[in-house]
Amino acid sequence: MVFPRLVATGRRGSAGGSDHVVELGLEIESPPCVLYGPPTESAGALLSGLVTVHVQGAGAEAGGCVVARLTLVLEQQVTYGRPFVAGPLGSCAACRERRRELARWEVVAQAAELAGGRHAYPFSHLLAGELPATSTLGSAGATQIRYELVADAVYRAGGGEERRRELRLPVLVTRSILRGPDRNSLRVFPPTDVTATAVLPSVIYPRSTIPLELQLGGVCCADRRWRMRRLTWRIDEKVRVRSHACAAHRARLRALEEEVRAKTARNLKKPAKPIKRTPDMGPQVTVSVATVEDPLPFDAGSAAARQEADVGNMDDDADTQSAFIHPSDHAMQQELQELQARIRQQQLEEERKQETSHYIEEVRTIAGTDIRSGWKSDFSGSGKIELVMEIDCMKLNSGVTNPVNMVSTTSPYLARGQAPVNVTCDVEDPTLGISVNHLLLVEIIVAEEMLHYTNGQLLSKGEAQGEGEGQGEALAEAKPAGLAGSHADQRLAELSPMFANRNNSMFRASAEEHSPGLEPDGSTAGADKRIVGTPTGAARVLRMQFKLTMTERSGLGISWDDEVPPKYQQVKFLYPPSYDEAVSASVSEVSGSSRVVSGPESNPAVRAPVAASPTQPPAVREGPSSLGTSGSAARDMMFISESSTLCIGGESPSALPAVEDASLGHRVCVRKVSELLDTDRITQ
């Protein structure tokens, strides 16, 4: 996937850039800021670079350049779109923007005289893992979350007045959740016996396709069956943003919050009407107030969730973390429940600390279509319908581009035009009160068919069960040779009784020609054993919804805490000696004057002193006991002549424990088991 490259372009001398003695520059040296994992588990991202001050030579020679102050600030900017209320809240610039300082560096705290040339100052910061990613929210894209590095310098050249220079560099922060095992979901649709099994990936990406495996089971029962007619899918994005007001208009926001709370209480007394959304339906914007009972966005008790709830066949997917826990592992289940309870309590505390609980919710459909073919139906036994399809998300653009790594006052950053942003990756930030979730909704329309024979005779329950298991064999036996290619007519017979009667007459005519004989009563025995289905006019809509985790691709990078630290040898100064250097002397001595002879694992190694002169190695022979009842272990026993001695590491054989061998009449030295298992000595 290729992103349009953003470069820092500009004209030298524009906006008075040529008459300044001091030029500022920002250069990012660290990899792109990618937060790996969910907000509760992410280790953050490292941001490091250089801020440069270039003093022109002419200004320095004229009287010197004194930099009074040079600061660098990393700030988070949240621009709120329309608050959907008239009055000062919609027109106040302070209410529409919120700034938060994440880090601050006093590069030059006191006045300092700088010589002509380039001066570089490094900086670094660890971005917290719970920060929201750079995002554009809503259908209009007016609400945005951005990060910027702002360099501010105040200088005085040649004894003149103080002048100020400012430089901004946008910092792109993205979040990537690594893909795990696919999720298997099971849905049940009472009062029918139909069950749906879906297989979905754990995470999805913008500008990609989502594989979906769907299987319907239990579509055949007794004398009826369900035939799939259409499948409709859509992806809904739910955005919830807490309203923001400046200190001057905070009282007006509280009054608006009380009005919305009273209106919500009145609406709760009325029966909720479900909203039937379609793929071509526009965004739906609602205003709500968070309470202690409903602190989290998109809970079952929220207004938007109650309106979209359908008690018939809606089944929310469970938390993705529970899919990795074995049902019998109660300890891990309890630990997960405690963790979720703590997170919920923290979010409750965050809600209570906030000055307002007024939220703006927007629900929109970002993708969806209908599928009318492509599945396979098998009506043998209990029956099943299988479908494997690709959900197209290639038109979804999250606005992520290549990051800008270098800007300067002579070449400032100018944003180029790009494709409109129509999707936002998942965001969960209780501090800002911003939440973005995605749901995949699947609706399957199945039509009911009544099974009967081609002559119109209905099936009893016992016959239907017997025919369901051996329907293929019965059809093969009853089908004449002349109708071997009438599969298309059989499909038409399942659609309408008129085609069934036509096929029945054709089958009888062919059966009379190919039948070897008739029954005593003049009727054929297997001519009318074919089973067809006739639509009854009844249909059901099977609705399912699955929670999707939309995230950016991780790329080739890894988290900073997963990187391998440098070795001692890679640090050029004050590093301790390596292992090889410490034992090089002993290794050289051992390699020139020692050998090791050992038996299998069942026998301890036998060491005997060996002469230092390069003589013929001692003969190794098998003793007479090797052919006894001890087996292979005894056959592998090696005996060393008493004239030889073996030693390791320059140790004297006298220090080793001696064992008398009565059968051979000489002494051998045996090492301890702990010394035999010393891998360092063995490798040396």
UniProtKB/Swiss-Prot annotation:
A GO term, aspect molecular function: ubiquitin protein ligase binding
**Which residue stretches does the UniProt record annotate as biased composition, category Low complexity?**
593-602
Check the record and name the InterPro entries matching this protein.
Arrestin_domain-protein, LDB19_N
- What this protein is called in its record is Protein LDB19
Q: Disordered: where is this region?
A: 462-483, 510-531, 593-632
Q: Which gene encodes it?
A: LDB19
Family under the similarity heading: Belongs to the LDB19 family.
Keywords, A to Z, come to:
Cytoplasm, Golgi apparatus
Q: GO terms for biological process?
A: cellular response to amino acid stimulus; cellular response to stress; positive regulation of receptor internalization; ubiquitin-dependent endocytosis
Recorded superkingdom: Eukaryota
Q: What is the protein's species of origin?
A: Eremothecium gossypii (strain ATCC 10895 / CBS 109.51 / FGSC 9923 / NRRL Y-1056) (Yeast)
UniProt-listed Pfam families: LDB19
Tell me where it resides: Cytoplasm; Golgi apparatus
Instruction: Describe its function.
Output: May be involved in protein-linked oligosaccharide phosphorylation.
Per the record, GO CC terms? cytoplasm; cytosol; Golgi trans cisterna; plasma membrane
